[in-house]
Amino acid sequence: MNDSCSWDQLWDQQGTLNEYTGKGIDLLERIMAYSKERASIELEYSSKLKALSKKTAMKMKSESELWNSVSYVKGFHDVIAGIVPVATQHELIAENLKSAVIPFTTQKIAEYRVAKKQLESDNSNLGKQLRMVIDEMAKSHKEYVKCYKETEAAMLKYAKAEKNMDISRLELEKTKNNYQQKCGMLEESKQTYAVMTTKANEEQSAHYDRKLPQLLDNYKKLHTNRILDTVEILSKCVEAESCVNQIIASCHNDMRRDIGLIDPSRDANLVVENMKSGHPVPQPFVFEDLGHPQDRSSFMGGGASGPAGSMDGMDATMKKGGTLMSKNGKGVARKQSMHQKFFGGGTADKKTDSGDYGTLPPQQRARKIAGKISDLEKEKDRATQSREGVSKMQAAYRENPKLGNPSDCDAQLAQYGHEIDALSNQIQKFKILLDDVNAQLGAGGLSATSVGGSDTPPSIRSVSSASSGVTSRVNTINDAHRTNGGVGGGRRESFSGSNGGSDTDPTINGNGHGRDELYEECSNPNPVLGEAIAQFAFDGAQDGTIRMEANEKLWLIEKDEGDGWTRVRKENNSADGFVPSSYLKVTWFGKV
């Protein structure tokens, strides 16, 4: 583009120039409106980001300790936390727009509107002044033309009168005087017209050569300054955002660093460490040889030797859940719950949980106790430091009584002493618990009495302990079978009485003859007390339990005695055992 272009060439385009200048100022107003809306959007965006981060963090707090400690979840936590400083920077963008861009733009818009109005007024005044001089020249020219025509008419009249011989001399003189008068007026109007023409030319020359170029130069200055201010305003808009880009980039780098700390191997170890129970795997199943049915034909007829009959009674008693033999040699027909079969003990051994993580599996309990010990030791250290601080303050009071009364510190020292003693007792208690748990974990599993003695409810003790306990009973029975020569060596006598279900205690003599046994026949299973439908599947992996499928129909042969287990039998009488009571939908027959 040619740089020599002059605004003087726009001498006849003032109207278009005014319209163009007004549009430039309107653009500044549009920039200001953009800045206001952008600031509002940035504030809303910042607020929504912070709300999102807070809402997500609140959801994370409700998760488990393991879930929040694995590195990939922690990485997500850190990224969410990193959103807050990013949101703060967007809030700063809005503040920069409000403080640096909008006020400056408002000021410039007002200045340029005033300047434009002044230029329009100056342009109007210059035009009016030029038109006024030109109008005066046109008026004098019109007067001059009028005088010229009147003089011409008077001259023709005088020439005609001079040739007319009939006109009087007086009339001729009168016509001549009129002609001469008109010639004077013509000369006077001519002089006036000449003066006004000169004045109009001078004014027009000044208008187009000096006044209008100066006005156009003012338009040019306004145009240039407005564009420069537009550039500055746009730069401020960009600077309002770019000044925080470095901080936002730093936040993003921190997020990348946190993401880089995600360690799958460490997470896998944490999962194992937090989920492992410490229970040993189930022990192998013990094969129980029942012999051949032909070997039982002798006791089916009513005769049997003492040892074999005793063994059969023992077997029947095991099926019923009673104890094998009392000290005086008498069998005790006493039912045993699933809870007692698995974990031993009765209701007298049940105690409430002391709050020492007794409901957790051994391995997790040991980890929790160790963490509790660490927390208590930290509390003890803080209490010890506080007591030392009070002791130093008391010593300072003793050296300088003006600072305070030393006896005022005695109450605090006593309080800290009690706290330290209580924390020490707690630490010692948990250390003993931890030693017990670690010792039993090192022994390969928990015994029937869980860590912490009977403080831990038997219902939550290790199932592996129950498995080993029941397995040992089965081994004892097998040993008895082998010692007495197998099941076929004797017979089982039925108990006397018309009901067949008497609960009187039977006595067993040495040779097995003349006994009133309570034990049931092997071929006579427990009576059916009701029916049940399995609501859920159960694997029956532990000893004494039975596998069942969802919606499977089962016979109820023993009620839940408060331990959460119910004894059932398959519908085809193929097997019986215990299942969780909560897994069943039961229907009892009559009064049970």
From Swiss-Prot:
Residues 527-589 form the SH3 domain. Residues 3-267 form the F-BAR domain. Residues 359-436 form the REM-1 domain. It is a peripheral membrane protein. Residues 363-441 form a coiled coil. Keywords: Cell junction, Cell membrane, Coiled coil, Cytoplasm, Cytoplasmic vesicle, Endocytosis, Endosome, Membrane, SH3 domain. GO terms for cellular component: apical plasma membrane; basolateral plasma membrane; cell-cell junction; intracellular vesicle; perinuclear region of cytoplasm; plasma membrane; recycling endosome. Disruption phenotype: Defective endocytosis by occytes characterized by either reduced or non-detectable yolk protein in the oocytes and by an accumulation of aggregated yolk in the pseudocoelomatic space. This is more pronounced in the double knockout with toca-2 where nearly 100% of animals display this phenotype. Double knockout mutants with toca-2 also produce 20% fewer eggs compared to wild-type animals and there is some embryonic lethality whereby the dying embryos display defective morphogenesis including failed epidermal enclosure with extruding gut cells and increased width of the intestinal lumen. Its main location: other. Residues 459-474 have a biased composition (Low complexity). Residues 343-366, 447-519 are annotated as: Disordered. SUPFAM superfamilies: BAR/IMD domain-like, SH3-domain. Interacts (via SH3 domain) with wsp-1. Interacts with cdc-42 and (via SH3 domain) with wve-1. Plays a role in protein trafficking, actin organization and embryonic morphogenesis. Potentially acts as a cdc-42 effector. May play a role in hypodermal P-cell nuclear positioning. Together with toca-2, is required for protein trafficking regulating yolk protein clathrin-mediated endocytosis by oocytes during oogenesis and retrograde recycling and the sorting of recycling endosome cargo proteins such as mig-14. Also, together with toca-2, controls the distribution of actin at cell junctions. Belongs to the FNBP1 family. This is Transducer of Cdc42-dependent actin assembly protein 1 homolog. It comes from Caenorhabditis elegans. The lineage of its organism: Eukaryota, Metazoa, Ecdysozoa, Nematoda, Chromadorea. The gene is toca-1.
